[in-house]
């Protein structure tokens, strides 16, 4: 009887009847009468009129009980009427009369086979072949039953014996396709894929419409990674059998993997097309939906990414990776509660999912929940002890908590595991700026060695088409991720607004992760003045370098340094003839391709001993120009008038508030009776951080009841108004405040700062001097204390200064955007003229590097393993914009099916799992 999916009845009569052979001789008269009756019976039987035919066969046998042909015909009718035992009696009788009757023997075999007696069936077919080797039906049916025997043996665990039976079947009938097919199945299970493929190909050659063979050929090609060949096999299969569900599912898998392959090779649009085609074959295939989410995330189409991640979860509620990646998208959109919900859902599916544990720690770090963050990141490390970026994020957490030594150790642990971690390498450089003085040369060497290694990861342009005409209009490019409500934005606004665009055309390269109203205002201003605005978030740094060259930028200015989302990889390519670093980082970048670093004579005095890779260019006044927030609100009276006591304060981050700073502050507070200290910092929403801070001050003699600790304030207006809580602002050292100092002064709060030997220490010196408060710049810790005490001693003078300070600041060079920009343009013009005269500091520097012999000692002081090969890594922000702190680079991770890549969007989709739908047909095909 026929078996589903295995039909090899070609060459047999349509009613399944085996041609009979004539029986023994009969008397002439009987033979004539019987022959007519027998012929009519055969006609009735061929028309499926078995009852009528049976009656005629009986009539013949009543007259001639030895008529073999009638016995065979009767047996066939009985078999058709589901009377196998009576039928086999007829066939056996025919064999008794004519032992060499191949037809009767073959029908005996058919009944044995239908009754499940395969061995007896095979013996009957073999006897038929022996009786008449030319009788083809016997050979064909023997091949069938041998194939069935082979399958039975294989299923019983006797694989070798099963293979032997398949081979015997092919010896009997070398054209029997199911035997080849089932051999292919066995060899596939034995992982002998070359043999399996040969067998499937022979099966398809013998039976061109063998859908299952094409399907399983596709599985082998798919598992070998030959996706195009696999897809071609599945297409052939589905042409034969359009509703073959296993083949459709396999096609969806192969197309999904091909989509990932071409996406990784750089053709993301074709990858998306393959993912969508996969859904045509299997509309509920969650892996294709997941990878579409990944692709749309990489294309920055986050709305579509969300749609497909949610679809993936609908069809596969256990897809923890989709939950994780949704969380990353919501995190980047500042929807932290939703992000936490997604990460927690991922962890409910995979409790030890290190990426989601890490990402939850990232969110808690951003929120200042340091204990919870530490717990999550430590769990991520426990789940995966080689998870390098978790150590990077632990370093960021320690840095935010003010534990710089622990932060550096965590970064170095990350670099031990992954020497290529760009985030940890750069975060380490940033953290070293918080360490006390006496470290300057080692800090310089750390930056310099990082820059030399980083440079090797990028090809450098060595020629430019920019015309060397000294006084022609210039194109100035500004590259930054901080064109939103962020500390850098308060200092870049003046040039964007006041540049003479006819002579200094501005091209903005904006890497903003999430644009806000300030972003849109900047963009509108630049475009209306005739500039160009390019959004480069998510674009590879080498591609950004190509854009810079296309835009014919003459001077490219980077505003980020080693803080989050920087484009130092673009600067390493040297796409512009002149390259500059400014504002975003308080030290050298260490990158040899950057010509100049913009500063002033107060932040970096001419006699400074601090070393820089770049050549210093000092602006005529301050190197900073502050554009106050329109949301600041009015200046309030100094609170001491109503309070009756002085309140000192600082809104700098904890990393800047070193133990030495706390010692000096405690000395001031202890010297001013009833005075209070207010400190605002993100981690102060964490009880353990608060208690540690208060305990430290208590050890220094300052009662905790005199200290107010405020957590992060999200709204900019409320943040600015919080300055009304303090009478006097205390700056930090050796890493002084920048935005916080400007905000303090703008809100009428005088700030006491201290000069030092490095730029980071002297930013407050520059700001206060240019505002007209040079008298508040101390040269020592003792003088710092004295200046603070002098201010606190005269509340009336403090009030007068407070109410006049905003006006004083507005008239100072620090807020004079027009004149500041003219000075900046003059500096740019001088740089350009030097270039036209053949003087480019970076080119000289690069030539010298080419001449340096290679050192065998890769371990420089404080620069172990700072290789940054992942040059297109981007990092999460740490601090809120209004705090004005430099941001370390947090790395959140997206998990993928099969692979994880480090990237800020956390949407790293690659190959989907293999679920090869192998079809195993067992050769039961007789009827």
Swiss-Prot record:
EC number: 2.4.1.255
Region span, Disordered: 1-31
Keywords from the named record: Gibberellin signaling pathway, Glycosyltransferase, Nucleus, Repeat, TPR repeat, Transferase
EC main group: transferase
Pathway assigned in UniProt: Protein modification; protein glycosylation
GO molecular function: peptide-O-fucosyltransferase activity; protein O-acetylglucosaminyltransferase activity
GO terms of biological process kind: cytokinin-activated signaling pathway; gibberellic acid mediated signaling pathway; negative regulation of gibberellic acid mediated signaling pathway; regulation of reactive oxygen species metabolic process
Catalytic activity, as annotated: L-seryl-[protein] + UDP-N-acetyl-alpha-D-glucosamine = 3-O-(N-acetyl-beta-D-glucosaminyl)-L-seryl-[protein] + UDP + H(+); L-threonyl-[protein] + UDP-N-acetyl-alpha-D-glucosamine = 3-O-(N-acetyl-beta-D-glucosaminyl)-L-threonyl-[protein] + UDP + H(+)
Residues forming coiled coils: none
InterPro entries: Glycosyltr_41/O-GlcNAc_trsf, OGT/SEC/SPY_C, Sel1-like, TPR-like_helical_dom_sf, TPR_rpt
SMART domains for this protein: SEL1 (SM00671), TPR (SM00028)
Tagged with keyword Aminoacyl-tRNA synthetase: no
Entry's localization field: Nucleus
Any Pfam family hit: TPR_16
Entry's family note: Belongs to the glycosyltransferase 41 family. O-GlcNAc transferase subfamily.
Name of protein: Probable UDP-N-acetylglucosamine--peptide N-acetylglucosaminyltransferase SPINDLY
Organism, scientific name: Oryza sativa subsp. japonica (Rice)
Gene that this polypeptide is encoded by: SPY
């Amino acid at each position: 009887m026929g078996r589903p999916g295995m039909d090899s009845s070609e060459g047999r009569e349509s009613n399944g009847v085996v041609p009979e052979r004539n029986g023994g001789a009969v008397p002439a008269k009987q033979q004539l009468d019987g022959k007519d009756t027998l012929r009519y019976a055969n006609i009735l039987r061929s028309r499926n009129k078995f009852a009528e035919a049976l009656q005629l066969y009986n009539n013949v046998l009543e007259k001639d009980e030895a008529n073999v042909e009638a016995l065979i015909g009767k047996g066939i009718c009985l078999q058709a009427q589901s009377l196998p035992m009576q039928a086999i009696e007829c066939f056996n009788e025919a064999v008794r009369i004519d032992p060499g009757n191949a037809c009767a023997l073959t029908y005996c075999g058919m009944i044995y086979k239908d009754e499940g007696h395969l061995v007896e069936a095979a013996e009957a077919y073999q006897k038929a072949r022996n009786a008449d080797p030319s009788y083809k039906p016997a050979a064909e049916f023997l091949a069938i039953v041998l194939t069935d025997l082979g399958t039975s043996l294989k299923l019983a665990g006797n694989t070798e014996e099963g293979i032997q039976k398949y081979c015997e079947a092919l010896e009997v009938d070398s054209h029997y396709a199911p035997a080849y097919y089932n051999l292919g199945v066995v060899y596939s299970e034995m992982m002998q894929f070359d043999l399996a493929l040969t067998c499937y190909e022979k099966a398809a050659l013998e039976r061109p419409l063998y859908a299952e063979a094409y399907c399983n050929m596709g599985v082998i090609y798919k598992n070998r990674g030959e996706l195009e060949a696999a897809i071609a096999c599945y297409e052939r299969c589905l042409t034969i059998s359009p509703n073959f569900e296993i083949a459709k599912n396999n096609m969806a898998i192969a197309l999904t993997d091909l989509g990932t392959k071409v996406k990784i090779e750089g053709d993301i649009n074709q990858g998306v097309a393959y993912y969508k085609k996969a859904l045509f074959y299997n509309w509920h295939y969650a892996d294709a939906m997941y990878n579409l989410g990944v692709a749309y995330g990489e294309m920055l189409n986050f709305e579509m990414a969300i749609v497909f991640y949610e679809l993936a979860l609908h069809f596969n509620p256990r897809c923890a990776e989709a939950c994780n990646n949704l969380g990353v998208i919501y995190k980047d959109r500042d929807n932290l509660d939703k992000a936490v919900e997604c990460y927690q859902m991922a962890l409910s599916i995979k409790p030890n999912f290190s990426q989601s544990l890490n990402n939850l720690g990232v969110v808690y770090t951003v929120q200042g929940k340091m204990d919870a963050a530490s717990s999550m990141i430590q769990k991520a490390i426990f789940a995966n002890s080689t998870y390098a970026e978790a150590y990077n994020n632990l370093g960021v957490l320690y840095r935010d908590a003010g534990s710089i030594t622990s932060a550096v150790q965590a970064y170095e642990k990350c670099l031990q595991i992954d020497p290529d971690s760009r985030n940890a390498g750069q975060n380490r450089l940033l953290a070293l700026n918080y360490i006390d003085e006496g470290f300057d040369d080692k800090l310089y060497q750390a930056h310099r060695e990082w820059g030399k290694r980083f440079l090797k990861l990028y090809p450098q342009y060595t020629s430019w088409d920019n015309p060397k005409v000294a006084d022609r209009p210039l194109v100035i490019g500004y590259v930054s991720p901080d064109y939103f409500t962020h500390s850098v934005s308060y200092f870049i606004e003046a040039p964007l607004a006041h540049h003479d665009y006819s002579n200094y055309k501005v091209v903005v390269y904006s890497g903003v992760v999430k644009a806000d109203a300030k972003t849109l205002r900047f963009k509108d201003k630049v475009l209306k003045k005739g500039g160009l605005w390019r959004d480069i978030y998510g674009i590879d740094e080498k591609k950004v370098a190509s854009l810079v060259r296309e835009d014919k930028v003459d001077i490219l200015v980077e505003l980020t340094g080693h803080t989050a989302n920087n484009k130092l990889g673009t600067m390493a390519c040297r796409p512009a003839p002149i390259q500059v670093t400014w504002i975003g980082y308080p030290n050298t970048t260490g990158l040899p391709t950057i010509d100049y670093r913009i500063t002033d004579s107060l932040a970096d005095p001419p006699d400074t001993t601090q070393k820089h890779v770049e050549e210093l260019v000092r602006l005529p006044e301050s190197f900073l120009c502050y554009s106050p927030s329109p949301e600041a609100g009015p200046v309030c009276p100094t609170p001491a008038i109503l309070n009756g006591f002085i309140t000192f304060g600082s809104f700098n981050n904890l990393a800047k508030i070193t133990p030495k700073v706390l010692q000096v502050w405690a000395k001031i507070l202890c010297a001013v009776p009833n005075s209070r200290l207010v400190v605002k910092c993100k981690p102060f929403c964490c009880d353990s951080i608060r208690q540690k801070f208060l305990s430290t001050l208590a050890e220094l003699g300052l009662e905790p009841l005199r200290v107010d600790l405020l957590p992060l304030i999200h709204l900019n207006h409320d943040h600015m108004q919080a300055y009304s809580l303090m009478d006097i602002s205390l700056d930090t050292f050796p890493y002084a405040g920048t935005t916080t100092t400007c905000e303090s002064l703008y809100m009428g709060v005088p700030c006491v700062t201290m000069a030092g030997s490095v730029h980071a220490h002297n930013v407050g010196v520059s700001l206060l001097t240019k505002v007209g408060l040079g008298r508040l710049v101390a040269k020592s810790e003792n003088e710092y204390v004295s200046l603070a005490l002098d201010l606190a001693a005269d509340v009336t003078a403090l009030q007068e200064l407070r109410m006049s300070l905003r006006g004083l600041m507005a008239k100072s060079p620090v807020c004079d955007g027009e004149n500041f920009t003219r000075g900046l343009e003059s500096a740019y013009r001088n740089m350009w003229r030097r270039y036209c005269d053949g003087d480019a500091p970076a080119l000289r520097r690069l030539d010298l590097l080419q001449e340096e012999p290679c050192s065998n000692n890769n371990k420089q002081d404080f620069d172990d393993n700072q290789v940054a090969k992942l040059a297109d890594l981007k990092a999460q922000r740490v601090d809120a914009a209004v705090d004005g702190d430099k941001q370390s680079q947090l790395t959140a991770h997206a998990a993928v099916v099969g692979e994880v890549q480090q990237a800020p969007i956390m949407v790293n989709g690659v190959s989907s799992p293999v679920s090869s739908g192998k079809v195993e047909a067992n050769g039961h095909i007789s009827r």
